[in-house]
């Protein structure tokens, strides 16, 4: 009796079925095993450091323009861009005979009529109507231009400017778009479309400057009088004394 009471009081071991070694009883589980907390910082991350931002993948631009080297993410963007190559300018300026392919170009142009230039250059007295114009101008103050032309000593701030320069000055077929009205030819369809306005100047509805200025020597027309004066000086050696450009 005393031996049985001592065994029941101990409660820690039971005799094994073979009677050789005692088997230790395990305490019953109170629930599923708890996983280690995930909020604890690992060996490579500190508790106070912010998470590293993930790098965005480069944008996919599968829609390439057949007239130039630009590419776009959506077909609608490509269709809007191709208006510039086709010469379509459905957005006329109400203050002069000029017209534009995009509403944003028209808005930027109208600032030239209002005279608003809210973006001054911090390095010189010039000011600009748009931040993009100021950003392009700031490159003129940069000590270096990182895109040199391999065919001449010129260098450029943007790859697009270098590509346009090489296409215009160093390509064998630099001017594949001839004008049907005169011997001139151009490198881009947009340049040809702008030139053809000289032969057939449009009249924008509601325009206040419908009177074009035509050269009496060659018949070329200009939307502004100062451009006519510059043309006559450079092409026909005509001097206009006492007149402001």
UniProtKB/Swiss-Prot annotation:
Where do the record's region annotations for Disordered lie?
A: 1-67
Q: Where is the composition biased (Basic residues)?
A: 52-63
Example GO biological process term? regulation of transcription by RNA polymerase II
Q: Where is the signal peptide?
A: none
Paired cysteines (S-S): none
Q: Indicate whether Zinc-finger appears among the record's keywords.
A: yes
Query: Could you say which protein family the record assigns here?
Result: Belongs to the krueppel C2H2-type zinc-finger protein family.
What this protein is reported to do is described as: May be involved in transcriptional regulation.
Official protein name in the record: Zinc finger protein 575
Species, as recorded: Homo sapiens (Human)
């Amino acid at each position: 009796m005393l031996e049985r009471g001592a065994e029941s009081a101990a409660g820690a071991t039971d005799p094994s079925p073979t009677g050789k070694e005692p088997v230790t009883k395990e305490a019953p589980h109170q629930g599923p095993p708890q996983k280690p907390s995930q909020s604890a910082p690992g060996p490579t991350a500190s508790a106070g450091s912010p998470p590293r931002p993930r790098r965005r993948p480069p944008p996919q631009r599968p829609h390439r323009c057949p007239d130039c080297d630009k590419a776009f993410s959506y077909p609608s963007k490509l269709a809007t861009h191709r208006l510039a190559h086709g010469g379509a300018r459905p957005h006329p300026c109400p203050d002069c005979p000029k017209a534009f392919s995009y509403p944003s170009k028209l808005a930027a142009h109208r600032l030239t009529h209002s005279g608003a230039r809210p973006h001054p250059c911090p390095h010189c007295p010039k000011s600009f109507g748009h931040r993009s114009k100021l950003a392009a101008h700031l490159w003129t103050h940069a000590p270096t231009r990182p895109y040199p032309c391999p065919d001449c000593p010129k260098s450029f701030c943007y790859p697009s400017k270098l590509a346009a320069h090489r296409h215009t000055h160093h390509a064998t077929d630099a001017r594949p778009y001839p004008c049907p009205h005169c011997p001139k030819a151009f490198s881009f369809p947009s340049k040809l479309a702008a030139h053809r306005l000289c032969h057939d100047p449009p009249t924008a509805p509601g325009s206040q400057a419908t009177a074009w200025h035509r050269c009496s020597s060659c018949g070329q027309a200009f939307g502004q009088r100062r451009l006519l004066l510059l043309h006559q000086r450079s092409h026909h050696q005509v001097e206009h004394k006492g007149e402001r450009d």
